[in-house]
A protein has these predicted regions:
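N-terminal intrinsically disordered, cationic/polar leader segments
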Residues: 36-63, 68-80
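Serine-biased, low-complexity intrinsically disordered segments, primarily in secretory-pathway proteins
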Residues: 14-30
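Short hydrophobic transmembrane-like helices used for membrane targeting/insertion
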Residues: 1-8, 12-14, 26
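Generic early N-terminus positional signal peaking at residue ~5-7
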Residues: 6, 17-19, 37
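Active-site- and interface-proximal helix/loop "cap" or "latch" segments in soluble metabolic
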Residues: 34, 69-226
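Residues at secondary-structure transition points
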Residues: 8-10, 22, 137
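Secondary-structure boundary elements
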Residues: 29-32, 56-57, 98-100
Length: 226
């Protein structure tokens, strides 16, 4: 078995009393305060999503994604009462990928579901993810293979966070992130992978002008003749 080491963790924090065990050890410095509430309110539901990435000693990478839904009150289901704080859904998807973001293995598991004995039977179908590439229409291909009644809506939704989680894991490990004078991009003709992938890092923007001056492209204004 390949040895793995954790590389990156992306976590949504949930309230302490309802926090599933695998969310409780998140360092305090990673916690985000809520935006100001516009009216008085009561907490009803928490959906927590966590992704861990591991670099394996065989050169591959594991992405482990988990989704947990909990309620703040006892919740009646067709199959019985789910107590406050007990997961209504607790599901996991693990992809093994190479450095080209090709999926070489895929596994899914449902540990808590609203309909035990039924929901979890679809897990093996998530092996259909093998052969996909996280940067080549991954979400569309997942919908085609596992959307609607072809899969579990929650497992399928969970896969949607994996492309960007993989890119964050690869940053500084597989993808070079340095800039400024003397960086790797000055020694090669390779454009930094993160440019032109969001509004802040557009090639004609001030952030690129400051941090990636070599790749800055000023926007040329066109003048209409009268």
């Amino acid at each position: 078995m390949a040895i793995v080491r954790p590389v990156v963790r992306a976590t949504m924090i949930v309230p302490g009393a309802l926090r599933p065990a695998f969310f409780r050890a998140v360092p305090r410095r990673t916690r985000m305060s809520s935006l100001p509430a516009s009216a008085s309110r009561r907490h009803v539901h928490t959906r927590a999503i966590r992704v861990d990435a591991y670099a394996r000693d065989d050169g591959l990478w594991d992405l482990e994604a988990a989704l947990v839904d909990t309620k703040s009150r006892d919740f009646p289901l067709a199959t019985g009462i789910r107590k406050a704080g007990e997961p209504v859904h607790e599901m996991r998807v693990t992809l093994t990928i190479d450095t080209q973001l090709n999926v070489v293995d895929a596994r899914a598991r449902s540990d808590a579901t609203p309909y035990p004995g039924y929901c979890e039977t679809i897990a093996a179908d998530y092996r259909k993810l093998i052969g996909l590439n996280l940067r080549q229409d991954f979400r569309r291909h997942v919908r085609e293979k596992l959307g609607g009644t072809l899969g579990c809506s929650h497992l399928t939704e969970l896969t949607s966070v994996l492309p960007t989680a993989a890119i964050q894991a690869f940053a500084g490990e597989v993808f070079k992130t340095r800039d400024a004078a003397g960086d790797d991009h000055h020694r090669t003709q390779e454009k930094p992978w993160q440019l032109d992938r969001c509004h802040a890092l557009r090639s004609d923007g001030p952030a690129v002008a400051r941090y990636y001056p070599r790749w800055y492209r000023a926007q040329h204004k066109t003048h209409k003749s009268n």
